[in-house]
Structures are given as C-alpha cells and as structure tokens.
C-alpha cells in the first residue's frame, strides 16, 4: 500500500507581488473564476508567475509600514508551508524545491515585500527538509538491454532517481526577486520559478518540476493593449547548475560498454554550468476572445565555451 499526503498551509497572508508558480491550485481557481465570469482579466496564463494586481482587492496583505504618498511600503507575505509524505515510492511533480523522497519532507517559505518608488524587493526564501529514505528504484534484475534503454534517458537529462543517500536540510533563495518597474514593464534579477505555456500540469518550457534558478528578466507586468490586441512577453538570461547526483548503477555495462556517460562539455570538462537565454511572446487578437498565439525560443551552452567573451558572466 502506498500513501501520498500533500498539505499546503497559509499562515497570515497568501498573496505576494507575483502569485507563486508552486501555488497551482490558486491558478486553477483563477482560471475557473475567469471562465465563470467572476473575474475579468486580460491575462492569458501563458507566462507565470503573474502579477496579483487584477485580484488585489481579494488579497490579504498585512502592511507593516507605509508613507502618505504610498510610494514606500513594506508588506508581509505570510508563510507558505508545504508538507509531503510518501509511504513507499516518491512522487515528484509540480513541487519545486522538493525532491523524489520517500517519507516526510516539507518546505517553509516566509516572505516580505518592499516597494520604494519603482524599486520592488521580494524576499521569500525556501527552507527544505526531507528525510530521503531509501526506496526501491529501477529494478536491478532487469535484463541488460532494458538498462541500456533506460540509460538513453539518463544520459541525456539531469534527472536523478534519488538525490543522494542522506537527509536534506537546506535554505535557498526560493521565490525572491529585485525589480525596477515602470508602467507595464519590469526588469530585474530573480530566483522565482517560471512557467511558459498554456498547459496545466506540464508546461511547454520551464516549470516547477524542479527548483528555481537565478536569472535576469525583462517582462511585461500585465498585457500591453494595442489596436490589434494584447501582447505579453518575457526575456530571460540565467545560469543552470547540475544537480550533482548520478543515476543508479553507474558501473553497469552492456555489450562490453559502460552505460553511464558523464555529462561533459565539448572540451571534456564535467559538471560545467550552462548559460541560457530564452524568450516567450504571447499575442491575443482583439477580434477573437480567448485565443492566444505564442512563440517560445530557448538557447543554452556550456559556460566554458563562452568564457572570456562576456566579462559580466
């Protein structure tokens, strides 16, 4: 018998400057409210996180400090508390910083939001704890050719079956960001999870299936209205690091050849981080309600290949 338990608690307040991508049920409720006509919005949900402004009246912020002109304020973002328990085999989908974990794990994420003129700072770190108990993974008794087929996946993706063999207890930046905002535009540095695409569980590109990463972003805060319709976009550049964990049985051989191929760059260097750039543009024609057309492009390369070419990397 397998038991899977997932809890999500709100302490104090529930909304932040951007609605956290990991709050999937909030997005689901928003989608349903839009379909039922309870909320009117031009957001397509193709680019997440989205700004909370269009439901601001429903937000439960607690203002800690504010001046008379409202160009300076500090607000509490409350505490998000995720709990997950698997009795037998891990479930690891749409849960951000959490890992494939048998047993108990949690994420605690307090937050505070500061606004000073065009500058906004959101500090919302995530503390993750997981017992990481051993579990039965890919069966050792499979025929070698089955292992060879499995390694076709593992050799082309950083998707460890298990994240080490000790418990996890660490704090990361989580859903934090520093931005400069002007009208409907925003530029800044962020560590937030990103979701590109109109899907519900599996995005077209980028998602919360894994922990977030550091990036620079230039994006629209809300749809830009024009004579022919609405436009949304996000352009990012960032840094992707390896998980640091290998798949199981890296010593396994098939037909006299080791199945495990270490991930190395074109110069033979292992564990090199990757530089990435990507963008998404979404267009909603004025004449057709509910239709959105999008374009997504993503480029990444190993850092050693561009070393010395860009001094700011």
Features from the language model and the residues they span:
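Short loop/turn motifs that connect adjacent beta-strands in outer-membrane beta-barrel proteins
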Residues: 67-70, 114-118, 181-184, 223-233, ...
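Residues that define the transmembrane beta-barrel architecture of outer-membrane proteins
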Residues: 103-108, 169-176, 181, 209-216, ...
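Bacterial Sec-dependent N-terminal signal peptides
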Residues: 1-21
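Transmembrane beta-strands of outer-membrane beta-barrel pores
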Residues: 83-85, 116-118, 127-131, 182-184, ...
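Residues on the lipid-exposed face of transmembrane beta-strands in outer-membrane beta-barrel proteins
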Residues: 110-114, 176-182, 189, 216-222, ...
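Residue-level detector of the transmembrane beta-barrel scaffold of outer-membrane proteins
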Residues: 42, 120-122, 186-188, 230-234, ...
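Signature for the C-terminal beta-barrel architecture of outer-membrane proteins
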Residues: 159, 163, 194-195, 210-313
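N-terminal periplasmic/intermembrane-space "pro-region" immediately following the signal or transit peptide
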Residues: 14-104, 109, 113-120, 125, ...
